[in-house]
Structures are given as C-alpha cells and as structure tokens.
Amino acid sequence: MTVSINEVSKYFSKQTGTVQVLENINFQLEKGDFVTVIGPSGCGKSTLLKIIAGLDNDFEGEIIIDGERITKPSKKQGFIFQEHRLFPWLTVEENIAADLSLKDKYVKDKVKEWVEIVRLDGFEKSYPKEISGGMSQRVAIARALLRDPNVLLLDEPFGALDAFTRSHLQEVLLNIWEQKKTTMIFVTHDIDEAIYLSNRIVIMSAKPGKIHKVIENKLPYPRSKNSESFQEIRKKVLQQFEYGGLIQTSL
C-alpha cells in the first residue's frame, strides 16, 4: 500500500484576488510509514491533510491511495481533528461504532477490541460529558481506526491537551502504530512531538506552502527526548527554521 501525493497545488479566491496556498507538493508514503508535517502557521498543513482525506477536491494534482485516485472521503482514510467531535448523545462505545450497529456481533467485537487498545475499559457506557478531554480524544482515535483505514490523518489531535495527557496519548498512538502498522500522517506545531513519533519529518515553508525539507528520523523506538541523538535531530530541524527562512516567513 502506498500513498502518493502528486503535483498538488491549491488556490483560494479572495476579494483581493487569488491566493496560492499550496505549490507543487510531491510526496510518497509506504505502508507503515509514520510521517509528521511541521511548518509555520499558514503554510497549508491542515489544507493538505483535508485534500488527502478527500474533504477538499478543489485542487490541482492528484492523491493516489493503494492505486485509487482520491476524490472524496472513503474507508481508505481515517481522520482525527483537533477537537474530538464526539456526539454528546452517544456513549463511548456508540461513538466508536459511529454509524455502525452495535447489534452486529462483528462490530461489537471490533468496538470491544478498540476500547481495550485505547485503554477505555469500564467507560463503554459513559457519555462525552462524563470523561476527560484526553479520554475523548482516545475515543476519536478508536473511531477513526475501527474500519481499518489504509492511512490515518491526524490534524494536531493533542494540541489542546496538557503536557501529561499529550505524552500519554503519544504512547497510546505509538502502541497502535506498532501493533497495526497503520500508515500515519500527523500534523503538529511541536518539534519534539514530531521527532518523538515519526520516522520522517516533512518541513513545510509558507506563502505558498511547499515542502522545504524532509528529514529521515532513524532513532530506534522507544525514544528518549533527553538522549543525545534526539537532541541532534532536534538541532537539524531547528536549523531549517533558523537558517531556511521559515521563521521570517511565518511573521
């Protein structure tokens, strides 16, 4: 399974004229890749993610997933937003099942499996208002992965969480990735998070958004943020921002 992002460009129309948001994005992922995307605000990270998800088909170029051109959302893509977007009138297990019936034994068993994977045992019958923000985001992760998507797209899913909860969910996500080998594309503003999670870091520049640099991250798992090798990669990433003009671009 591959994900191919080919010659993708995107324009927005404004009263003052047309603005190019993305320019000539080319990138490929193989099955099981974990890629993080970072860059200054306004460089089109979230826009690119929505294009890959099939949520935006007004663009130039093409997205190919497992040989199929993507023009709309499908079971090939799972998407996790910055907010969990749970249905407040549904329980945890009903939110994970979403539009599938829990009366179906296969669905019931799959939901049970994901409840265990994201460590929500005992909260199956709870409603979103009865659980924490971190737990709600775990429900969103389970919901997105229930249908075994080819690729999971994550748009800063931990950005609004406290440091402890974010660290915990990073471990949950890595455990899922190691178990299921799901291809992941994860947008973040956090350099340490990008290095900690992924095996490739895509750095984007802005105005218009384009790929500035791809850094291979071959650190073995599990990773320590305090290790010398981790800090070396962090230095490489920061150098791209400091000397690549990215900080100025974001001002």
From Swiss-Prot:
Entry GO MF terms: ATP binding; ATP hydrolysis activity
Subcellular location per the Swiss-Prot or TrEMBL entry: Cell membrane
Keywords: ATP-binding, Cell membrane, Membrane, Nucleotide-binding, Translocase, Transport
Main location: membrane
Signal peptide: none
Occurrences of domain ABC transporter (ranges): 3-231
PROSITE patterns documented for this protein: ABC_TRANSPORTER_1, ABC_TRANSPORTER_2, SSUB
CDD domains: ABC_NrtD_SsuB_transporters (cd03293)
EC number: 7.6.2.14
Ranges in a coiled coil: none
Membrane association type: Peripheral membrane protein
Catalysed conversion reaction: ATP + H2O + aliphatic sulfonate-[sulfonate-binding protein]Side 1 = ADP + phosphate + aliphatic sulfonateSide 2 + [sulfonate-binding protein]Side 1
A Pfam family it matches: ABC_tran
Summary of the function given for this chain in its UniProt record: Part of the ABC transporter complex SsuABC involved in aliphatic sulfonates import. Responsible for energy coupling to the transport system.
Family label: Belongs to the ABC transporter superfamily. Aliphatic sulfonates importer (TC 3.A.1.17.2) family.
Identification of the protein by name: Aliphatic sulfonates import ATP-binding protein SsuB
Recorded name of the encoding gene: ssuB
